[in-house]
Structure formats: C-alpha cells, structure tokens
Swiss-Prot record:
Name this protein carries in UniProt: Transforming growth factor-beta-induced protein ig-h3
Residue positions, PTM S-cysteinyl cysteine: C65
GO MF annotation terms: cell adhesion molecule binding; collagen binding; extracellular matrix binding; extracellular matrix structural constituent; identical protein binding; integrin binding
Location within or outside the cell: Secreted; Secreted, Extracellular space, Extracellular matrix
Effect in UniProt of substituting R124S: In CDGG1; late-onset; mild ocular irritation and reduction in visual acuity
Length: 683
C-alpha cells in the first residue's frame, strides 16, 4: 500500500510539473543566456558560468547556444573560461562557487563587482557615499574601471574639477530611486534617474544583451542591502535632443537635412517612438551619380523610400550586435547588420563611421554610403546588381534602354549571364523583336502570378504563366531568383532565353522536317484537329529516325492499323503543359491514351520513361513539344508484356537505332526562326 501511495504521488508530480512550469513567469532573454552559461559550467561545480572572452581584448560574454558552438563574437575567436555566476563566490577546498556572496550596502558592492573607480569618485563627493551606505532602495548602473579610463581627458577633467556639481550629477544620472532587476528591464523602456528625473533608455535584446543608454550590462543583478548594482561598460550621459534636432545641428548632415524636410519625415523624427537612423553623411550622397541622385530627390515617392530605408523600427545599439542579424527597415527592405571586431557592418560592408549617437527617440549611426532600396531604382539600376549584365547589354544595343530607365510600368524578363556562355546573337530585327518579347507591359510581382495567366509583351505576344510545385515559369523560361521591384519596373531573373510560341503544335511539327513521318501518322490517325485547336498539351514528338528505328514488323503493324496508331500517338500527348523547368525528380503525366508518362529531370537532362529527350521546350500556342528519338510504347503494347516472339531482338534493334538517331538527328533540324537565332544560347 505504501509503495502504491508513493507511485501515485510521483505520477501526480509528473503530471503537475509541466503545468506548473507553463504557469510560471517566462524568463527574460538575459536570464535564458545566463541559464545556458550555467548549464555549460555545471561540470565545474555549482554556480559556475561559462564565459566567452574575445581573444586579444577584455570583452566577456555569457554564452548562448549559437556562440558556444561557433566560438566567435563579431567574427573574432573566443576562449571559454569558467567564473562564478553573479551573486556567488568560491570557498577554499570546495568545487565550484557554492557560497552566496554576503550582502553589503551599495557602496561596498561596487567594490565586489569591480567598479572601484566609481567608489573612488563617490568618495570625492560630499553627499553620495552616505546615501549609498544608508537606508533606502536604489539601483546603480556602475561604469567599469575601463569605462572611466576610456573617457576623453577633457570630459574627465570637467567632471573632477567640480566634484559636487558635475561629478555628483553624473553619478546620480547612473542611479534609479528603486531596485530594478534584469527581469524588469524591458526592451524600449525608460527609467527615471536620480539626476533631475532625466530618462535612461533600456534595451533588452533577444540575444540576451541588455543596454543602458547603449552601454552593455557586464555583470547584472548584484544585490545589496539597499538596492542592486549592475556593472556597465561605458559612462553614460544625459540625452537631450531628438533625432531631428541632431540632424539639424550637425554640419555633416546638410544634404540629409534637406532631404528629410522635402520628404516630410521630420515630424516622425522629432516625435515619440524608438528608431535607429542610419544617417548618411554629405559624403555618402556625393558618392551617388548626380543623374541618379537628382532623379530620386526630384521624385517624392522614391525619396521617401530612400529615407525610410535608412530607418529601423526600434533602437539598435552597437553593443547588441555580436553576429549577423537581419533587420527590416521602415521601407520594407531587409538589411544584414553585423560586426567585424569593433566595426559595425551593413550588408557585409564597414560603412558605419560613428555609432551610438543617442537621441530621446532612438539612436543614430553615421554611414558613409547611401542605402538605395530597390523601390527607388530603375530597371537598369536593378539589373546592375544582378547576374544579368549580358542580357542588359543586349537590350541597350537593341535600342530598348529608354524602356528600362523611364517611368513606364514594366516587367523585364532578363536571362542569367550563364545562358549566354556560348555567345550572344547579332542585333538584327529578329533579335530586337525577341528582346521586346522579354518586356511585359505591366509591373508585376511573381507572388501574384497564377497558372494559365497571360501576359502581354512590348512585342505584341501573349505569354503564358505556368505554376509548378517548385517553379514558376513564363513559357519555356522559369524564374531563377526573387523579384527585384523597382520604382516603375520589376526585374525577373530567368533561367533561359524565352521562346514565344510560333503557332499550334501542328504548325510546329509541320514546320520542322524532322517530323514529316510523325505529321503523316497524326493525319492518318485523325488527330490533326486535336493538335490544331485550343488546348494544353505536352507532345513528346518522335523524329523520323525514331520511326525508322522501329522493327519493320512493328512499323508495318502500326501504319496498317489506324486505331492502334491513334492509341500509340495519344500516349505521346500529355493532357497539360509541362516545360522542362517544371519537372522535378519525377512527374507522372497523364496521356490522352489514359496511361501515365514518367517524366524526370536529372543533370539538366529531361527523360520520358527513362529515355532522354533530345530537345525540350519548343513552345506552341496550345502546348509544348519535346523532341524524342524513340517511339514510346504504352505499358500494354510493350514487347515484354505482349509476349512477342521477337521481343528481345526487336528491343535491341530499337535501342541501337535510337542511339543512331540521337547522334544524327541534329544535322537535319529545321527550327523556327527564333530557335535558329538562339541555337547557340540554349542549354
């Protein structure tokens, strides 16, 4: 009975445990990082925390999971050391840090956390030490000794030359008139300091970094009998101006100041809120070609997008960045903010020349390059940053440059440079027309395209959209990269030159002498009307050589039986359009005959029923034609399944003839005019 009771109690504890955990308060990011550091240090004894130190510096961080495995902070290697967690100390002869630190008053606790310089300056004032040692409840954000030592000499001199006013006020600004622990330090909050009730800005980032006026907490939550001490890495000062006021008084922001005024963003930048302004200097504007800069400054929408691309939705202090971080601007562009040693980077470039200029409504970082968003660019400017320079040169040579730099609403279908590895076509009337058919008469976004949609080109063609499981294609060409949406135009990067349809499937087959036997067979089987009318077909078209490679007996049987011939031909026709870019590892395509075709793509080679396609993607208005060098057999007609006496030998002849046909068919090709023009460029 006693055993049963114990088991029942254990079961209840297990059942209630998770519920109790869920009901408890969520830990702050700082506490979660501290907890991880404890876990990593527990092998060294109780209350031991793992700390990462950046090699060659005195910078230390409690370690999170990602940093633990990477062993890097801001790209610099780190070493792991093990220290007592906050609030604990070693005991001689004992493992780890088993003893809690004895509580003392704030003044004495400053010495415990290593802020002896703050103690020294406190002693110099007449009033502050008695307050720190007396009754009450306070929080002090105490600068480290290194923080005091790094102050400019003139600043330090001004403080110590008037200790009972300047120094006292500076120290009081680091204090709050109540106990505040890290769990209460919320991102974006302000605390009222003990100096003229001036605000202190608090930011608590998801990576566990906590900043006070952009100074990082080094050692937090050291309890005292009359409050708590947090050690920080900088001496902080009062914040008086908002972002707009700083822009107005700094000479290096003359151009930015004019741009902000013209855009109407000054109201936001002087209002409430918390922002990060990546503030371009005058030199940053001067680096932009005058034509581009004048165009943007003269376009209110582009100008607003440009400036919003330099504003983040919350305050981001430099100390919060310990690795690459994706952040979204007010304009909507994602920037990669990172660090390399002591330098901040944007999109991998060290363009921040001055950081952590604090404002009442955020923080400013000076940058030496303008961050022009796609939404403020022309199609030419979008293409300059993409792998489509060869295509852009062709558009320019063809006299289409005005369409790519003007204010027409267009979408450019630009093939990748790799498409032209074998050369580019001469610029003639056919090439110009082809290129015009790579420009859509509307500014599109790929996320709104749908299967079967038609798009009108500058060349007057109607192009179809095909949506597949893993690709989005326009005719035979598929989108190879994310859209770039500019001020008026959108850039689609395409995986090949687009071939507009030149006629129906029957027109395509009749126009190519490789298919004369297939055309005759289609006519004999009564399928001409089917392949001439509107529809969505995928035709695997056997060449003349494919028919000649059939065993004579098989060929005679087919040509002598219209019903059987129609059955075979329908097996070559899929009931939807499948271009090569839409083929995954394996697609089962239903044929008009009823059985399914197995279509696959491996190493950029399309195969149907495991036989390679000689030439894919000849587009027609009612489908697509893929050239094959063998005649496909429906499952019920294959020699092995019919028990044909000549099955083995016929199959061997078929394979040999198919191999010969694949080798020889290229010499007899007669392609439509666009395909001849692009023959050298096709994959």
């Amino acid at each position: 009975m006693a055993l049963f009771v114990r088991l029942l109690a254990l079961a209840l504890a297990l059942a209630l445990g998770p519920a109790a955990t869920l009901a408890g308060p969520a830990k702050s990011p700082y506490q979660l990082v501290l907890q991880h550091s404890r876990l990593r240090g527990r092998q060294h004894g109780p209350n031991v925390c793992a700390v990462q130190k950046v090699i060659g510096t005195n910078r230390k961080y409690f370690t999170n999971c990602k940093q633990w495995y990477q062993r890097k902070i801001c790209g610099k290697s780190t070493v792991i050391s093990y220290e007592c967690c906050p609030g604990y100390e070693k005991v001689p002869g004992e493992k780890g840090c088993p003893a809690a630190l004895p509580l003392s008053n704030l003044y004495e606790t400053l010495g415990v956390v290593g802020s002896t310089t703050t103690q020294l300056y406190t002693d110099r004032t007449e009033k502050l030490r008695p307050e720190m040692e007396g009754p009450g409840s306070f929080t002090i954000f105490a600068p480290s000794n290194e923080a005091w030592a790094s102050l400019p000499a003139e600043v330090l001199d001004s403080l110590v030359s008037n200790v009972n006013i300047e120094l006292l006020n500076a120290l009081r600004y680091h204090m709050v008139g109540r106990r505040v622990l890290t769990d209460e330090l919320k991102h974006g909050m302000t605390l009222t300091s003990m100096y003229q009730n001036s605000n202190i800005q608090i930011h608590h980032y998801p990576n566990g970094i906590v900043t006070v006026n952009c100074a990082r907490l080094l050692k937090a939550d050291h309890h005292a009998t009359n409050g708590v001490v947090h050690l920080i890495d900088k001496v902080i000062s009062t914040i008086t101006n908002n972002i707009q006021q700083i822009i107005e008084i700094e000479d290096t922001f003359e151009t930015l100041r004019a741009a902000v005024a013209a855009s109407g963003l000054n109201t936001m930048l002087e209002g409430n809120g918390q922002y990060t302004l990546l503030a371009p200097t005058n030199e940053a504007f001067e680096k932009i070609p005058s034509e581009t800069l004048n165009r943007i400054l003269g376009d209110p929408e582009a100008l607003r997008d440009l400036l919003n691309n330099h504003i983040l939705k919350s305050a981001m202090c430099a100390e919060a960045i310990v690795a690459g971080l994706s952040v979204e601007t007010l304009e909507g562009t994602t920037l990669e903010v990172g660090c390399s040693g002591d330098m901040l980077t944007i999109n991998g470039k060290a363009i921040i020349s001055n950081k952590d200029i604090l404002a009442t409504n955020g923080v400013i970082h000076y940058i030496d390059e303008l961050l022009i968003p796609d939404s403020a660019k022309t199609l030419f400017e979008l293409a300059a940053e993409s792998d489509v320079s060869t295509a852009i040169d062709l558009f320019r040579q063809a006299g289409l440059g005005n369409h790519l730099s003007g204010s027409e609403r267009l979408t450019l279908l630009a093939p990748l440079n790799s498409v032209f590895k074998d050369g580019t076509p001469p610029i003639d009337a056919h090439t110009r027309n082809l290129l015009r058919n790579h420009i859509i008469k509307d500014q599109l976004a790929s996320k709104y395209l749908y299967h079967g949609q038609t798009l009108e080109t500058l060349g007057g063609k109607k192009l179809r959209v095909f949506v597949y499981r893993n690709s989005l294609c326009i005719e035979n060409s598929c989108i190879a990269a994310h859209d770039k949406r500019g001020r008026y135009g959108t850039l689609f990067t395409m995986d090949r030159v687009l071939t507009p349809p030149m006629g129906t499937v029957m027109d395509v087959l009749k126009g190519d002498n490789r298919f004369s036997m297939l055309v005759a067979a289609i006519q004999s089987a009564g399928l001409t009307e089917t392949l001439n009318r509107e529809g969505v077909y995928t035709v695997f078209a056997p060449t003349n050589e494919a028919f000649r490679a059939l065993p004579p007996r098989e060929r005679s049987r087919l040509l002598g039986d219209a019903k059987e011939l129609a059955n075979i031909l329908k097996y070559h026709i899929g009931d939807e359009i499948l271009v090569s870019g839409g083929i995954g590892a394996l697609v089962r395509l239903k044929s008009l005959q009823g059985d399914k075709l197995e279509v696959s793509l491996k190493n950029n080679v399309v195969s149907v029923n495991k036989e390679p396609v000689a030439e894919p993607d000849i587009m027609a208005t009612n489908g697509v034609v893929h050239v094959i060098t063998n005649v496909l057999q429906p499952p019920a007609n294959r020699p092995q399944e019919r028990g044909d006496e000549l099955a083995d030998s016929a199959l061997e002849i078929f394979k040999q003839a198919s191999a010969f046909s694949r080798a020889s068919q290229r010499s007899v090709r007669l392609a439509p005019v666009y395909q001849k023009l692009l023959e050298r460029m096709k994959h």
